[in-house]
Every structure is written in structure tokens, then in C-alpha cells.
């Protein structure tokens, strides 16, 4: 079962927590869920060049707090914070409530599964050979501390007449082990021959304590140790 299920959903409540963190009664739940989906779709499309790894949405009393984890936060913030203010106003209109916007820098994009998948998809769109793109991503992830990585590419690879799936793995990726800290990300490459799908699994080690926030806390600590200078974070109210 661990081979087929989404590794993040499989570990929710064990060593992963939800990206939408709020509570609502039955009357409001559907509306807020659709709001979250619209916010994420808008941000992923609008900030495509900023390398969005994750969007966390929290809803304290009659407010909305959106935290964007990005590999290139400067593109979101803009000159003197002009772009982030426009973005905050747009999100306030979408949620119809006061919205706070936080930007958190991802210091090691090479070991973030979503960013790795996006990078490979962009290379496929630029007609880079899929094997070269996969191998380069694997080498970068292992060099920066990943204990294992697996990448699959599916579609008309290299312009082939028949679609197929190719995969590459290095190190351990124990999908059945619930205490394993496994990051998972997907992306689509819109090539001249059709859409190619990219999936990435990255094994970052084992988390022995039973704590839903453990994976997120561990990633933050790793970023702070690996990066130079202070953590780059911008809050806009």
C-alpha cells in the first residue's frame, strides 16, 4: 500500500501536519475549502517563477494567514515590498477577510520534492534530455544530505511515439515505513509532444518521536544550519 498511496497523506498526524490549518462547522467548511483551493491555484500560477514549494493557510478568528514557502522570495516581495502588498490585497479580496501574508525562504531547494519536480518539468519543456535532468537532480539531492531519492517521468519522453514511464533511484526510499520523513512532489511538463508527468520522492531520514509538526520543524532547523546568515522571512500585515 505504501508504494501507491500519497506519502504525505499516509503520514498525516504521525510526522506530518496539514497545509490547511483551521476548523469550521458544516455550513462553512465547503466554502472555506474551495477558497483554499482557489488561493493555492492562483499563487502557483501567478508566482510560477518564484519556485513555490508549499502554501500553508491558517484561519484565526475572521482572519486569514497565508505562508508561502519559496526558493526565490525576492521575486514575491518586489522592490520595497510593492509586489507583496498587491498580492496581499488580491488575497484579501478572494477571502473577503483581513489577510496576513508571510514569505519563508526555502534554503535548500535541491532537497524539496516539489521544487525538484518543477525544475525537471521546466527542463523537459526546454528539450533537455530527461535522463540528464533526472540524474542531475538526484546527484544534487544526495550531495545536500538526502538519504534517498526516487524520480519518475511519464509521457512521450524524447518525442517517442508510445508513452512510457522511466524512473531513477539512489539511496533508500522506504515508503512503507511510517516514521520515515519522505517528501513528495509532482509537476507537469507541457512539451511539444504532449504532457509529461514528473513525480519525486525524497527520503530525509527517520523521525522517531510521534509529532505531526516534527517534519516541518526538522526542515526549518536544516535550513537554518545549511544557510548563510539569518533566516529570510518577511511578514506583511
Curated annotation (Swiss-Prot):
One cellular component (GO) term of this entry: cytosolic small ribosomal subunit
Residues annotated as domain KH type-2: 39-107
Annotated segments matching region Disordered: 213-237
A single GO molecular function term of this UniProt record: rRNA binding
BP-aspect Gene Ontology terms: translation
Keyword vocabulary terms for this entry: Ribonucleoprotein, Ribosomal protein, RNA-binding, rRNA-binding
Subunit-level organization: Part of the 30S ribosomal subunit. Forms a tight complex with proteins S10 and S14.
PANTHER family reported for this sequence: 30S/40S RIBOSOMAL PROTEIN S3 (PTHR11760), SMALL RIBOSOMAL SUBUNIT PROTEIN US3C (PTHR11760:SF19)
Function as written in the Swiss-Prot or TrEMBL entry: Binds the lower part of the 30S subunit head. Binds mRNA in the 70S ribosome, positioning it for translation.
Similarity comment: Belongs to the universal ribosomal protein uS3 family.
Name the record gives this protein: Small ribosomal subunit protein uS3
Protein's organism: Rhizobium meliloti (strain 1021)
Lineage: Bacteria, Pseudomonadati, Pseudomonadota, Alphaproteobacteria, Hyphomicrobiales
Amino acid at each position: 500500500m505504501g508504494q501507491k498511496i500519497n506519502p504525505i497523506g499516509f503520514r498525516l498526524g504521525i510526522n506530518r501536519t496539514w497545509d490547511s490549518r483551521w476548523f469550521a462547522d458544516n455550513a462553512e467548511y465547503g466554502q472555506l475549502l474551495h477558497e483554499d483551493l482557489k488561493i493555492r491555484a492562483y499563487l502557483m500560477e501567478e508566482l510560477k517563477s518564484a519556485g513555490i514549494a508549499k502554501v500553508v493557510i491558517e484561519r484565526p478568528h475572521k482572519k486569514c494567514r497565508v505562508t508561502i514557502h519559496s526558493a526565490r522570495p525576492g521575486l514575491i516581495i518586489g522592490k520595497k515590498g510593492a509586489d507583496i502588498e498587491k498580492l496581499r490585497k488580491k488575497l484579501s479580496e478572494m477571502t473577503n477577510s483581513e489577510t496576513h501574508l508571510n514569505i519563508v525562504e526555502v534554503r535548500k531547494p535541491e532537497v524539496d520534492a516539489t521544487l525538484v519536480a518543477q525544475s525537471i518539468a521546466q527542463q523537459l519543456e526546454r528539450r533537455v534530455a530527461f535522463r540528464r535532468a533526472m540524474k542531475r537532480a538526484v546527484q544534487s539531492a544526495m550531495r545536500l544530505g538526502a538519504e534517498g531519492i526516487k524520480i519518475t517521468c511519464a509521457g512521450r519522453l524524447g518525442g517517442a511515439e508510445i508513452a512510457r514511464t522511466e524512473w531513477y533511484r539512489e539511496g533508500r526510499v522506504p515508503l512503507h515505513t511510517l516514521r520515515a520523513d519522505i517528501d513528495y512532489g509532482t509537476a507537469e511538463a507541457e512539451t511539444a509532444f504532449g504532457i509529461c508527468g514528473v513525480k519525486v520522492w525524497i527520503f530525509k531520514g527517520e523521525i522517531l518521536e510521534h509529532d505531526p509538526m516534527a517534519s516541518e520543524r526538522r526542515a526549518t532547523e536544516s535550513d537554518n544550519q545549511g544557510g548563510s546568515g539569518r533566516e529570510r522571512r518577511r511578514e506583511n500585515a
